[in-house]
Design a protein with these regions (language model features):
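Alpha-helical recognition/docking segments in bacterial nutrient-uptake
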Residues: 1-88, 152, 270-271
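Periplasmic-binding protein-like
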Residues: 34-41, 99-101, 133-134, 154-164, ...
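Flexible loop/turn connectors
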Residues: 146-271
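Glycine-rich phosphate/diphosphate-binding loops that line cofactor/substrate pockets in enzymes
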Residues: 87-98
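Residue-level detector of anion-binding/catalytic polar loops
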Residues: 8-10, 59, 96-97, 127, ...
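Hinge/beta->alpha junction and helix N-cap segments in small-molecule ligand-binding domains
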Residues: 13-22, 75-85, 101-146, 161-170, ...
Length: 271
């Protein structure tokens, strides 16, 4: 809002309950001439909002990227590079069996972050294990469920990379329920830098995004787009910063040890 105010522009936030409602809201704002341009966050791979605005030749800037970049301006964080670095950090600790819990595949960032994870594994000379790569976790509850699934594997990972912090927070309760400790028995690294990551114990190691800088750049890019600059000249990326917590470190348990502890925890629950 500060960047917009400095240029005497007003920023209005519009929310909706779903895609159809959001598209209707965009069309209404355009028809009523209540907006000169739009910032579109959390972009889909084939974003319907982007397609609508592009077809109507209405200025917009994406907070993210899309599969078809024609006519698109954007600001985005290189989440794929963060995922690659997360893998290499875990490998430097001594981990060799590393799982991946991604976000919803409808979002473009999920595909990019999976690419980054794959690249990190390749750079480390490690084979990908498809059954240790899961997706669809955008919430704490989903993260907990998928963490339980990975840690209940016949040969579970000793470390897990999460595409989003919200899902990573669910790993704490999942690990506890299975008789494991995050940061010791299982290492995790995530991405987003949400405040809640500092409240868990041990604090979450994550790649942090400066939301204030992102908001400022998005507003500045949109104003330039409204003033007629070509979208191809308004494409910026930045990197996330590693925020070290206590959730990752050298493996204190092997995959085999994790199996034994999980089985013991389940037996204890039954009895």
């Amino acid at each position: 809002t500060t960047a917009a105010s400095e240029e005497s522009w007003t920023l209005t936030v519009a929310t909706s309950a779903g895609e159809a409602e959001m598209l209707a809201t965009l069309e209404r704002l355009i028809d009523e001439r209540k907006a000169d341009g739009f910032i579109l966050p959390r972009t889909g791979t084939h974003d319907a909002r982007m397609r609508l605005l592009r077809s109507l030749n209405v200025p917009f800037v994406l907070y993210g990227r899309v599969a078809d970049p024609e006519g698109c301006a954007w600001y985005d964080i290189l989440g794929e590079e963060a995922m690659r670095e997360a893998v290499l950090r875990l490998v430097s600790h001594g981990h060799r069996r590393i799982g991946f819990i991604n976000g919803g595949m409808e979002y473009n960032f999920s595909g990019l972050r999976e690419e980054g994870f794959r690249q990190g594994m390749a750079d480390a000379g490690l084979d990908l294990q498809a059954d240790l790569m899961l997706s669809g976790a955008m919430t704490r509850e989903a993260g907990s469920a998928l963490t339980r699934r990975l840690l209940s594997h016949d040969a579970p990972p000793t470390a897990i990379v999460f595409a989003v912090d919200a899902a990573a927070l669910g790993a704490y309760e999942a690990a506890e329920a299975l008789g494991l400790e995050i940061g010791a028995d299982v290492s995790i690294i995530s991405y987003d830098g949400i405040p809640e990551g500092a409240w868990v114990r041990p604090p979450l190691t994550t790649f942090s995004v400066d939301s204030r800088v992102a908001g400022k750049r998005l507003a500045e890019l949109l104003i330039r787009r409204i003033r007629g600059e070509a979208p191809e000249d308004l494409r910026e990326t930045a990197t996330a910063s590693l925020q070290v917590g206590g959730s990752d470190g050298p493996p204190a348990a092997t995959s085999e040890t994790i199996v034994l502890r999980v089985n013991a925890a389940r037996a204890g629950t039954v009895t």
